[in-house]
């Protein structure tokens, strides 16, 4: 329901330039529990992401979403973490960044971008904001 009201809100208030959804897949995982609801969950997630992507395009706003990650305990080599939501989230995203923390340093890896190869950036979070290490 909230998502359906988004277009009306964007028409009404042209000052909105950024939409942030924290934990985009979390609500769908809570609402559609178990493997038996996987198809419904993925369909509704795809619908939500489509509405967000179209709203961003038609109303010239940036859309940023965070997502959950899972771990594959059977993976023996490499990073066992993966993005929750499968291909639907991957295909709906223009840029995908993977963040990780090591001590006080933070790392951002651009794992999918239409204009750049995979790259890493190191940064610090301080009281003043984001800073170079």
Regions found by a protein language model. Name each.
Residues 3, 46-49:
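Short, well-ordered alpha-helical scaffold segments within catalytic/effector domains
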């Amino acid at each position: 329901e909230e998502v359906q009201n988004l277009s009306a809100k964007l028409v009404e208030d042209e000052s909105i330039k950024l939409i942030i959804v924290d934990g985009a897949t979390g609500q769908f995982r809570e609402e559609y529990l178990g493997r038996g609801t996987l198809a419904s969950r993925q369909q509704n997630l795809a619908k939500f992401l489509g509405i967000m992507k179209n709203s961003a395009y038609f109303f010239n706003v940036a859309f940023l979403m965070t997502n959950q990650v899972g771990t594959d305990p059977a993976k023996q080599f490499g990073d066992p973490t993966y993005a929750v939501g499968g291909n639907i989230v991957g295909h709906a995203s223009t840029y995908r960044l993977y963040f990780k923390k090591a001590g006080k340093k933070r790392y951002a890896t651009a794992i999918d971008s239409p204009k750049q190869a995979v790259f890493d950036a190191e940064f610090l979070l301080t009281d003043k904001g984001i800073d170079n290490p």
